[in-house]
Regions:
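N-terminal binding-site loop/beta-alpha segment at the start of enzyme catalytic domains
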Residues: 1-81
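Conserved, mostly hydrophobic/aromatic
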Residues: 16, 39, 54, 67, ...
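Short, acidic/polar
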Residues: 31-45, 98-114, 157-165
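Acidic-and-aromatic substrate-binding clefts and catalytic sites of carbohydrate-active enzymes
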Residues: 57-65, 92-94, 129-132, 181-186
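Acidic (Asp/Glu)-rich catalytic clusters
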Residues: 68-81, 111-115, 166-169, 192-196
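A short, structured active-site edge motif that brings together acidic residues
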Residues: 80-94, 122-125
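Active-site groove signature of glycoside hydrolases
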Residues: 111-130
Length: 314
C-alpha cells in the first residue's frame, strides 16, 4: 500500500468509502447492502492490507453503526484501528446558537454510533452550509475542536463550487470529485489553490461512475456524446501500457496536493483487488498529463455530468 504524509499523518492513498455498508447503493450483482458479517470482512480485509482510513457519514444509512460495532470488536481483540472520517449536514441555520447546536448535536450522534470519544476527521458534508455563513462555521468548528472532540476539520464539495473559498477556509482538508475527463478545476486554478493551501485533498468519483471501464460498443446509443472521448481514452491507456483503472487512478494521484482517493467496495475480494490497483499506479509524466489534457480539454459537459446520462448499458 502506498502512503502519503500530510498534516502529521501517514495516510494510505486508498481510503475505504463505506456508504455501501449502510444502505443499498448502486446497481449490479453486489448492490444490496451486505450482511454485518460481510461488512466486517470488508473492513477487516481493508485494514489488514494497509488501508488506514474509513470514510462514512451520518446519512449513509447505518454505516456508522456498523463501523462502530466493528471498531468495538477490533479494540477488544487488540487489533490496529484506522482513522475515521465522518460527515454531518445539512444543517439548521437561523442563528449562531441554532447552527452551533445542530453541528454539535449531529457530531455527538456520529460519535455515539461510531462508539468513539474523539473523531479523527470531522467533515462538513455540504459546501452550501459553509458558504451560507463562513465566519460562523469557522468559529463553531474551532470551538468544537477546542473541546477535544475531533482532530482535523474538512469540507466536502462538488466541482461546481469555489475551490478558492475552500482554500481560504482554514479547514484542514477537503473532499472533491475529480477524474481524468474533468479538467475544469485544473484549468481555472482551483486545484492549485487547494494544493497551495496545504489542505489534505481527498478525492472521490475517480472512475466517473464506471464510465472509464466502458467502450462505445457497450454504451446506450443515446450516450454517443461520450464515444469520441472513450475511444481516445482507450488509445491513451494502451499507449501508456496501463489498464483503464490504473490510468484513471494514476491521473488523480499525480495531481499536486492529492492525499487520498476514496473508493467503496462491495466485497472483501474487491478490497484486495483495489489494493493491488493502488500498487499498480504510476506518477504520470508531464508529457502524459499534457496528452490527457489535449484529449479532454473542452469536453462535452454531458460526459462529466452523470445526471445528464441515459441508461449506459445496452
Amino acid at each position: 500500500m502506498k502512503y502519503v504524509q500530510a498534516k502529521g499523518l501517514d495516510l494510505s492513498a486508498f481510503a475505504l468509502g463505506t456508504v455501501q455498508l449502510g444502505l443499498t447503493y448502486g446497481l449490479g450483482e453486489h448492490s444490496e447492502k451486505p450482511t454485518e458479517e460481510a461488512a466486517f470482512a470488508i473492513l477487516d480485509r481493508a485494514v489488514d492490507l494497509g488501508v488506514n482510513t474509513l470514510d462514512t457519514a451520518n446519512n449513509y444509512g447505518d454505516s456508522e453503526a456498523v463501523i462502530g460495532r466493528w471498531l468495538t470488536k477490533r479494540k477488544a481483540e487488540g487489533k490496529k484501528l484506522p482513522y475515521i472520517v465522518t460527515k454531518v449536514g445539512p444543517l439548521k441555520h437561523g442563528s449562531y446558537d441554532i447552527l452551533r447546536y445542530d453541528v454539535l448535536y449531529q457530531l455527538e450522534g456520529c460519535m455515539k454510533r461510531l462508539c468513539i470519544d474523539k473523531l479523527d476527521i470531522f467533515m462538513l458534508h455540504n459546501y452550501e452550509d459553509y458558504a451560507q455563513d463562513r465566519d460562523a462555521m469557522q468559529k463553531i468548528f474551532a470551538d468544537i475542536k477546542s473541546q477535544g472532540l475531533y482532530d482535523y476539520s474538512a469540507i466536502s464539495a462538488y466541482s461546481r463550487h469555489d475551490y478558492g473559498v475552500i482554500a481560504e477556509s482554514g479547514f484542514d482538508a477537503t473532499q472533491i470529485p475529480i477524474n481524468v475527463f474533468d479538467w475544469g478545476q485544473i484549468e481555472n486554478g482551483g486545484m492549485q489553490k487547494l494544493a497551495d493551501s496545504g489542505m489534505m485533498i481527498f478525492t472521490r468519483s475517480v472512475f466517473l461512475q464506471g464510465l472509464v471501464f466502458h467502450t462505445p460498443e457497450d454504451l446506450d446509443p443515446r450516450m454517443d456524446f461520450c464515444f469520441p472521448y472513450l475511444n481516445r481514452f482507450i488509445e491513451l491507456y494502451k499507449e501508456f501500457e496501463l489498464s483503464p483503472a490504473a490510468l484513471a487512478l494514476s491521473f488523480v494521484l499525480s495531481l499536486p496536493g492529492v492525499t487520498q482517493a476514496v473508493m467503496g467496495c462491495d466485497t472483501a475480494d474487491q478490497v484486495e483487488s483495489n489494493c493491488k490497483l493502488f500498487d499498480q499506479t504510476v506518477k504520470l509524466t508531464d508529457e502524459q498529463m499534457n496528452k490527457l489534457h489535449d484529449a479532454f480539454h473542452g469536453i462535452d459537459p454531458r460526459v462529466i455530468n452523470p445526471g445528464m446520462w441515459f441508461n449506459r448499458m445496452k
